[in-house]
Design a protein with these regions (language model features):
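Generic structural signal for well-ordered, non-membrane alpha-helices
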Residues: 77, 81-84, 104-107, 126, ...
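TPR/TPR-like (Sel1-like) alpha-helical repeat modules
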Residues: 117-137
Length: 191
């Protein structure tokens, strides 16, 4: 696993903004495209064929695995940023990109837990559920099929969504410690 940042950014807490503050852990870094455009161009454009090549491509992409590690280790703002790069690389409006946008909303919901903002948690979780679709729909060709298309285990995503939907306010993690994991569920690669 690649080294994790020294803190998980939470807006309004004492840690500096990772990108805009000179003391931020990402300040001054330039980010290459998570998937080089020429690699994406080699994938077939026909959806069924594309779905067969994308999981293996992502599973071997260090940035994709790192984004999952960030989320699973409690670096929600950072995973949001990492997935946003994939969202752009996958075209923002493709079905795969919309699925990644759902993952972005899961990370945003976790940031809202750290901020102590229940309405934000509810809103982002609801949006994630809409974008991620029926995760049991893989066999029916539904949006949930993109969990497998992107190399993720659908049940792991379902577990995260369920946990967010049932998050109790007495469990708010507004601690200002460098990293606080708010979920017990992890996102996992399929297989």
């Amino acid at each position: 696993m690649r080294a994790l940042p020294p803190y998980s950014y939470v807006p309004g807490h004492e840690h500096p903004h990772p990108v805009t503050d000179p003391l931020g852990h990402l300040y001054g870094r330039t980010h290459a495209a998570p998937i080089p455009p020429e690699t994406l161009a080699q994938l077939p454009s026909e959806p069924a064929s594309r779905c067969q090549g994308l999981p293996s491509l992502l599973a071997t992409t260090p940035q994709w695995r790192y984004a999952l590690d960030l989320f699973n280790e409690g670096f929600y703002w950072e995973s949001h940023e990492a997935w946003e790069a994939f969202w752009h690389a996958l075209g923002r409006t493709t079905s795969e990109a919309r699925f990644v946008q759902g993952l972005i909303h899961l990370a945003a919901a976790c940031v809202k837990i750290r901020e102590g903002r229940p309405e934000g948690v509810r809103r982002h979780t609801q949006r994630a559920r809409t974008l991620l679709g029926d995760l049991g729909a893989a066999s029916r060709g539904g949006v949930g099929a993109h969990a497998a298309t992107l190399g993720l285990a659908p049940e792991s995503i379902s577990n995260v969504i369920r946990e967010l939907e049932h998050y109790r306010t007495e469990c708010w993690h507004t601690s200002k410690t460098p990293v606080v994991r708010v979920l017990s569920a992890d996102l996992r690669l399929a297989g």
